[in-house]
Amino acid sequence: MRIEAATETTRELLDALTSLLAQLNPQLKPLTMERLARVIGDPATTLLVVRDDSRIVGAAAVLVYATPAFVKARIEDVVVDEHSRGKGVGEALVRRCLEVARERGAEIVELQSARWREVANRLYPRLGFELRESNLYRLNL
């Protein structure tokens, strides 16, 4: 297993992420090459992929940004292919996300996980995350 930052917009990456994101949320619109290029080109974002041999089996995005209060990191879209789950891929991926956040100067790291993702919700406290009481608001533009 190898975890690396995606630095090029390729058809292989697009196809792998499209498949992975559909497993994360089947209602998401398909990823486009333009959106993928925007993610990879965004200096605040590090897109990590997990390869098993040459196949991409997992991914996550780490966003680091500054506010007046903190330099924050958010871990987004953590997903491991259903055939690779239970092998420590997700834990290794999140640990690498935390390394990226530290390397980029983050003081705190936040992530959000759906309640039904039971395995993920057991993993995060083991890695030091604390469940927070919060009202999360969203507005689709």
Name every feature range the model reports, one short phrase each:
Residues 101-113:
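Conserved GNAT acetyl-CoA-binding A-motif
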Residues 91, 103, 115-133, 138-139:
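Conserved active-site alpha-helix within GNAT-family acetyltransferase domains
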Residues 18-30:
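Helix-loop element at the rim of GNAT/NAT acetyltransferase active sites that forms part
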Residues 65-75, 85, 132:
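A conserved beta-turn-beta hairpin within the catalytic core of GNAT-like acetyltransferases
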Residues 28-49:
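Active-site rim helix/loop that mediates acceptor-substrate recognition in acyltransferases
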